[in-house]
């Protein structure tokens, strides 16, 4: 999605449609949806719930696609992917972004799985990357190696 489409779909047309549905159904409709593609994480940070659940909880690509498809029908074009570590499912997220080019996907990530291939534009996709690098503080990580990896990833 290019910036102009993001502004139009996510912040103007989509927002106006969400407001229309709020009035029509007399309920609060979100303008952004958050979902966790996976509970898996490559780090084990102190205090983080993901370390307790391991990698058992995963949304299938079909479930993620259904969430976005139904959200778009409601005028929602902004999706925040958290986890676990969402880049553990980066291929599915690339596929999702390529399929839903009128939506934007914001990844809340520790950044340690971002490599050169991740940063290259995807063929057939107009998506631009929106990342929030969650680096935390050194004392929050369970190991010095995890802290260094997270701190140097960006």
Go through each PLM region and give its residues:
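Secondary-structure boundary/capping motif
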Residues: 56, 88-89
């Amino acid at each position: 999605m290019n910036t102009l489409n993001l502004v139009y779909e996510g912040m103007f047309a989509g927002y106006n449609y969400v407001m229309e549905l709020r009035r029509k159904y007399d309920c609060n409709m979100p303008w952004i949806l958050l979902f966790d593609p996976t509970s898996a994480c490559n780090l084990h940070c102190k205090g983080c719930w993901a370390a307790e659940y391991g990698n058992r909880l995963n949304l299938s690509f079909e479930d993620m696609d259904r969430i976005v498809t139904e959200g778009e029908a409601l005028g929602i074009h902004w999706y925040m992917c958290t986890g676990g570590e969402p880049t553990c499912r980066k291929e599915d997220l690339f596929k999702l972004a390529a399929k839903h080019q009128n939506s934007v996907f914001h990844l809340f990530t520790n950044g340690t799985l971002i490599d050169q291939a991740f940063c290259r534009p995807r063929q057939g996709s107009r998506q631009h990357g929106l990342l929030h690098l969650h680096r935390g503080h050194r004392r929050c990580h369970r190991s010095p190696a995890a802290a260094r990896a997270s701190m140097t990833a960006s």
